[in-house]
């Protein structure tokens, strides 16, 4: 059933309303629930509790969409002209194969991208327990309607957005939706804060989140696309996905080539007519010249180089889902990183411990019979599973793990002190207590908020001795609590008492009194050790790291300082922005503010999208990392979305362009290095192909002006499709240049032709064309045989381009500043292409097809010498460029 947009005012204000007021608005009796008649009416009004997303386009529609790329249009036009005007079907077939291959790759990538929205559907709870017609029923979750009374307990997936009516020690894990790193304590009190963020709505539970502890009764306030997950699905379906830098570069290159090709063809046509040549002849010459100017192999070579990059990245734990993402990573200027699980371990860990009057770090050795360890372990609901893994609330598992690290005999203590009674955690008193038999008496263990627990303590244990708790003790304990809280540690206190008996129905005010204070523990989700070093490397490469999290500002700021995102020892609050503060800003204000902000806290999915978009408005290439459902819209909005392979939801992975197999921020920096290498290698291939094609154009154009017939179409075709292709692919296997991570990221407005590449293409093309024309003239002067002159020009142009492949290993660096033969693939490609070129010239039958004459050994020496000279000329030009750049 299709969902209808009939959202009521009470649905938006449910978290602010008193329960009786809400139930009157909902018209739902809490004890009996809705009747079957009510349910039918509401299903007709509101529709189904399911995510409705736009229908995916068909494979054929996706395939046709790929042909809207400008470079592809140019290639198709070239194929058509080649086939119908000059009847060169070989060229047309090759071009069409290249275009179809690229289209297929694009379809595969788009199909993968749609997985994000599909994965959202898998989050839904299959069933829900509701009160209907005065009975408790189990129904399919898609049958829920607003006003349904739902029963929740530990282990349930919340089936819709709901306002709590009753809550018994309820904790809900909302990390995937809000980014909060620990389960949230829930209660039923109305929220007075206007426009409170979803992370601050303690009386609400949201579709797709997990109940980790306690029980509750709630009323459904939103279903399907009206839920918070539904809003995310809607943002995913309508996320703006801009073209990647590579796609923009190829578009610009295609347009530039079109203008150049049309201009050259027109000038050649007019010049030929002025020289008295026939219109039909000049039309064919112009078409041949235009087709020769197009680097037919560039899209295929780019695809191959990107594919090689994906393989290299996969070996380094970065799994690329879309090919252009490889190159986009290299251009990254800003990394908007989620905190939990990416910059931190997503594992609460005790870092500080206060006992025996001293605050110490976690490395301190604590005796296994210490009351602090015992209380932390016994007043605890976490368990070890069959594989020895701790299961339970992250705060509680952190306590048990700390005890295990201290070699505490966990199983022995559980057997020795079995739990016989308990006072569960309650959000009002913020304590939990358990009772355990101990000889003829009972041991009461209590843990909870330090300020609450300290009020109930009358004694303190130090060095095994119990004494009365003094006012000075209280001040010292609260002082240490404050110190840890300032470091964004979550602080819990532990205490104990010896009882004579256990009440059947224990009451806090009776049993949680006159306790013996045992100590404090401070815990945090710690930063990954390698993350700080990776952030420093990124900074050295000119890449800014920004933290975005659903956690509180104080916690986020502390972690950011420890990671080096913010400087230590300074007042950094001005560089931290909360979701509430962001909400007050217009898009224009945020666009101006983002360069100043390094940490965003308590943000919603909409905020994350706005942050990414604001950076993009500042002209930056943005990477966004995330693992939760709440990250998915921003992942899709970013120039490159980076998901987490271990902790990431299927939704976040589906919205990503790249997935980190190890969830490690360091891997992003490694991938940026690989991306820079890939861009550099594509740039080298572009420089190589365009300088080669420009050299051919110069040769043909000048020859036309001079009335020479220097190269035949079959010669150009052979060089473009054989001689050029193998070295261009091999250039994609070049190693990263030594300073690749010391350079600043390239600007978003830059292109393949920036930073000296265009100048290099022009002068190197002129060199290739000039040397080819020179040998044609030289052969004519000394050997007086037209066919031999054409052959020597053909051989020289081919060999020139093979030698030139080594020149483009670096735009400015000397070829001999290192090992010029360090790329074995380029060496092999050059030898293979040279062998094929030699083969068509000296092999009987084949040389007749190509209309060439085998030169003598001496003539080959001339060809080789002139071809090799391009290395000398380019080395001189590079030296001049380096001198000019230094002086500038």
Could you say what each language-model-derived stretch is?
Residues 782-788:
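Membrane-helix interface and helix-disruption motif detector
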Residues 808:
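A C-terminal functional module that forms or caps the active site or interfaces directly
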Residues 1-745, 752-753, 766, 777-781, ...:
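Conserved cytosolic headpiece of P-type ATPases
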């Amino acid at each position: 059933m299709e969902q209808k947009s009939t959202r009521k005012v009470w649905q938006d204000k449910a978290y602010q309303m008193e329960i009786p007021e809400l139930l009157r608005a909902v018209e739902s009796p809490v004890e009996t629930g809705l009747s079957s008649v009510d349910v039918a009416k509401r299903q007709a009004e509101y529709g189904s509790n399911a995510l409705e997303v736009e229908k995916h386009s068909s494979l054929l529609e996706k395939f046709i969409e790929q042909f809207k790329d400008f470079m592809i249009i140019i290639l198709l036009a070239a194929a058509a002209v080649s086939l119908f005007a000059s009847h060169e079907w070989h060229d047309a077939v090759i071009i069409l194969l290249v275009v179809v291959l690229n289209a297929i790759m694009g379809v595969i990538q788009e199909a993968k991208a749609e997985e994000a929205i599909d994965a959202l559907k898998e989050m839904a709870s299959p069933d829900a327990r509701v009160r209907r017609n005065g009975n408790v029923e189990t129904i399919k979750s898609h049958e829920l309607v607003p006003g349904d009374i739902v029963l929740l307990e530990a282990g349930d997936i919340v089936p819709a957005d709901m306002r709590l009516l009753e809550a018994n020690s309820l904790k809900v894990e909302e990390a995937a939706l809000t980014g909060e790193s620990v389960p949230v304590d829930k209660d039923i009190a109305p929220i007075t804060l206007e426009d409170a963020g979803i992370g601050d709505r303690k009386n609400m539970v949201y579709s797709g989140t997990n109940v980790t502890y306690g029980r509750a009764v709630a009323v459904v306030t939103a279903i399907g696309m009206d839920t918070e997950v539904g809003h995310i699905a809607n943002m995913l379906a309508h996320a703006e996905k801009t073209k990647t830098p590579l796609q923009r570069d190829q578009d610009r290159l295609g347009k530039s080539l079109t203008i150049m090709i049309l201009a050259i063809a027109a000038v050649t046509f007019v010049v030929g007519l002025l020289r008295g040549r026939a219109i039909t002849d000049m039309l064919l010459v112009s078409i041949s010249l235009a087709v020769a100017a197009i680097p037919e192999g560039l899209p295929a070579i780019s695809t191959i180089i990107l594919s090689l990059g994906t393989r290299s990245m996969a070996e380094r734990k970065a799994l690329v889902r879309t090919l252009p993402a490889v190159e986009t990573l290299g251009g990254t200027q800003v990394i908007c990183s989620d905190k939990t699980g990416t910059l931190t371990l997503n594992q609460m860990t005790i870092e500080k411990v206060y006992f025996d009057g001293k605050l110490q770090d976690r490395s301190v050795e604590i005796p296994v019979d210490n009351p602090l360890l015992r209380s932390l372990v016994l007043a605890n609901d976490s368990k070890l599973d069959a594989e020895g893994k701790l299961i339970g609330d992250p705060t509680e598992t952190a306590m048990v793990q700390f005890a295990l690290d201290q070699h505490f005999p966990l199983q022995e203590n559980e057997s020795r002190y079995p739990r016989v009674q308990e006072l569960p955690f309650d959000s009002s008193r913020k304590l939990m207590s358990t009772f355990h038999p101990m000889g003829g008496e009972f041991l009461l263990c209590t843990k909870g908020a330090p300020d609450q627990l300290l009020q109930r303590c009358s004694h303190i244990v130090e060095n095994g001795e119990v004494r009365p708790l003094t006012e000075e003790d209280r001040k010292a304990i609260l002082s240490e609590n404050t110190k840890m809280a300032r470091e964004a540690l979550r602080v819990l206190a532990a205490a104990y008492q010896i009882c004579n008996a256990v009440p059947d129905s224990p009451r806090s005010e009776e049993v949680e009194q006159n306790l013996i204070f045992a100590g404090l523990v401070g815990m945090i989700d710690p930063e990954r050790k390698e993350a700080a070093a990776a952030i420093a490397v990124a900074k050295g490469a000119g890449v800014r790291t920004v933290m975005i999290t659903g956690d509180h500002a104080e916690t986020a700021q502390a972690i950011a300082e420890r990671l080096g995102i913010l400087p230590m020892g300074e007042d950094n609050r001005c560089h931290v922005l909360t979701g509430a503060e962001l909400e007050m800003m217009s898009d224009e204000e945020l666009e101006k503010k983002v360069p100043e902000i390094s940490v965003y806290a308590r943000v919603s999915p909409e905020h994350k999208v706005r942050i990414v978009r604001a950076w993009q408005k500042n002209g930056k290439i943005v990477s966004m990392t995330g693992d939760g459902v709440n990250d998915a819209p921003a992942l899709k909005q970013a120039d490159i979305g980076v998901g987490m392979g271990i902790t990431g939801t299927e939704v976040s992975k589906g919205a990503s362009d790249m997935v980190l197999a190890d969830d490690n921020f360091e891997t992003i920096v490694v991938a940026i290095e690989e991306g820079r290498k890939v861009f550099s290698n594509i740039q080298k291939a572009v420089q190589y192909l365009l300088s080669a094609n420009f050299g051919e154009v110069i040769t043909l154009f000048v020859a036309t002006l001079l009335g020479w017939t220097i190269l035949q179409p079959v010669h150009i075709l052979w060089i473009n499709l054989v001689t050029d292709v193998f070295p261009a692919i091999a250039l994609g296997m070049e190693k990263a240049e030594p300073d690749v991570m010391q350079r600043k990221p390239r600007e978003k407005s830059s292109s393949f032709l920036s930073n000296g590449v265009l100048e290099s293409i022009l002068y190197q093309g002129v060199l290739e064309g000039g040397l080819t024309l020179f040998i044609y003239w030289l052969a004519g002067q000394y050997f007086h045989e037209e066919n031999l002159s054409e052959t020597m020009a053909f051989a020289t142009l081919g060999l020139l381009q093979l030698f030139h492949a080594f020149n483009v290993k670096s735009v400015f660096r000397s070829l001999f500043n290192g090992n010029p033969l360090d790329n074995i693939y380029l060496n092999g490609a050059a030898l293979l292409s040279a062998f094929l070129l030699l083969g068509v010239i000296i092999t009987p039958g084949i040389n007749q097809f190509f209309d060439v004459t085998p030169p003598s050994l001496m003539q080959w020496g001339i060809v080789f010498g002139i071809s090799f000279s391009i290395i000398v000329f380019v080395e001189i030009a590079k030296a001049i460029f380096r001198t000019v750049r230094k002086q500038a």
